[in-house]
């Protein structure tokens, strides 16, 4: 089985823990608490601030990307009919084109 890792700059944030029709959940380990300084990921992906919060350790929260947002990114081209595996492969090719700091890696 392939492992899906999530990175911010050179720091591994976590691994993909679940995929369903609406959300992709990435568990953030406890030692990564300042990686999203100034709400970088929240701003970039429009995440609800309940999931990215300075007041709570990130280990207690999940970072959530909504598939509807992803479908609006031309690089992703994720279709509703795509299987979870197909979505993972497409997501693995995604990068933040503005900063090249956040990316998903398939190992």
Write out the residue ranges for each language-model feature:
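Phosphate/dinucleotide-binding and metal-coordinating scaffold of catalytic cores
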Residues: 1-107
């Amino acid at each position: 089985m392939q492992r899906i890792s999530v990175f911010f700059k050179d720091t591994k944030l976590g691994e993909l823990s679940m995929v369903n029709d609406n959300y992709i959940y990435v568990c953030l380990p406890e030692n990564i608490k300042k990686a999203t300084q100034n709400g970088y990921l929240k701003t970039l992906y429009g995440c609800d601030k309940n999931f990215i919060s300075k007041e709570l350790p990130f280990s207690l929260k999940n970072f959530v990307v909504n598939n509807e947002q992803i479908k609006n990114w031309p690089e992703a081209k994720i279709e509703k009919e795509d299987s979870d595996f197909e979505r993972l492969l497409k997501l693995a090719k995604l990068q933040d084109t503005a900063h090249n700091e956040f990316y998903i890696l398939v190992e």
